[in-house]
Structure formats: structure tokens, C-alpha cells
Amino acid sequence: SKVSNQQITDLVNLLTFVADDKTVQLKEGVQITDEIKDTISQYKSGGITKDNRGVLDEYYTDEKLVNAVRNLIKDNFKGKTAINILEPSVGMGNFLHAATDLGVKTNITAFEINDTTAKITKLLHPDTQINLRSFETEFVTDNGTKKDFTPQYDLVVGNPPYGSHRGLYLGLGEEEKITRYEDYFVKRSLDVMNEGGTLAMVLPSGWLNRAHKLTGAELTDAYRLPNGA
């Protein structure tokens, strides 16, 4: 039976909570059944998130695309026993499937600004650390003070927001020269990626025209998707 977004929101609020450190946690004793997964997977993105980023910034990535990305990266981690993975704008977690079955233990950290989708993702991927805050908060405080950061990820995956970089963090002096969200997410993901790491993102085709500006990274593969994909 069909369920509404509001019913799904109510359900995930019953099952999860947001800790003081802004991570989403499961409530004690919660058992995630197939029925729960089926129900919450029906959530439809829409409306305006509390950060006033509209639906355009919430991407729900196609399964075939995610599998294709996984096939491209799956042999990159031979010889490692464990890797740290970042998904900087996780949405409902579809792209996390690209980080499965890589032949190594994975420690996954994800960021999401929408309360409901962050909680859905925690229920669908309970072993992932889900942070209910924007990726920008890794680099700047709410009063504009720059934060120290260190490279820590071996793999970054995702389908980041596209379009003009706007809003609070730009105003706080966070990468003011970067005018587009996708460029910001690539640059900052590279900043926290270990030497020899892999970044695999779905980006608008126009990004390739600006890829030469990347420093400290090498573009190894680029695939153009069909229009409307």
C-alpha cells in the first residue's frame, strides 16, 4: 500500500534520533525489518529543505548508474584491508551501493542536510555514519572560523548538488572563488582524500570544461551519460 511522505517522516522519527554531535542514531532496540525498508524507500523527494535548497539539490541516483560506477572502481583497493569512504551529499543513500562488495572492510561517513532523508539513509545503511549537517561544516564553523582538516578518505563517491554556490557558507568565506556547488564538492572532497585515493562522482558535463583547474588530482576516466539519464 502507498504511504505518504508524512507517514514516512513520522516512522523514521519513531525509529531514529539525532545525537548532540549531529549524527543520526537508531533508537535502542530498533530492528530494521524488510517491511520498514520497503516503506521508507517509497519516500519521494520534493519541497524545500530547511536550508532553503530546493528539490534541485536532492538527487536520487539511478541504480544502473551506481552499479556502473562500482564496476569502475572495484579493483582500485587491492592490497588494502580497510578503506575510509566519504559521501558528501548522501540523499537517500543510493550511491552508497557503489561502495559495497569492494573486497575490503569499509568505514563510511556521509553528510545530508535533509532531516528525513538522513534518517531514511541511516535505516537503510545502519553501519554508515550519517551526519545531519552540510559538508561545508567540515571546513568552517557557523561564525565563519576556518576549521583544520586532514586527508582521511580513500574513496569519495556521490552525485553532489549542481548549480550556483550560494547560501550561508559562501557568506562565511568558505571557498568564495568557487562559484558552483559541484566544483566546491569536488575541490573539498579532494582536500580530505588520501594520496592515491579515488573520487567517483556524477557531475554535469560542463564540469569537464573546468576540470583543468584541478590541482593535486588526475582525471583518469570520464563518461558522458545520455541526455535525461
Stretches found by the model and what they are:
Residues S1-Q129:
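Class I S-adenosyl-L-methionine
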Residues R53-D57, G167-I178:
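Glycine-rich phosphate-binding "P-loop"
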Residues V55, Y59, G163, G206-L208, ...:
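Short strand->helix junction
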Residues V69-L72, N76, N84-D101, R133-T137, ...:
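Conserved proline-anchored active-site loop of SAM-dependent methyltransferases
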Residues T81, V104-N107, Q152, E195, ...:
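Short loop/turn motifs at secondary-structure junctions
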Residues N107, R133, T141, P151, ...:
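RNase H-like polynucleotidyl transferase catalytic core
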Residues D115, K177-G228:
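Conserved Class I SAM-dependent methyltransferase catalytic core
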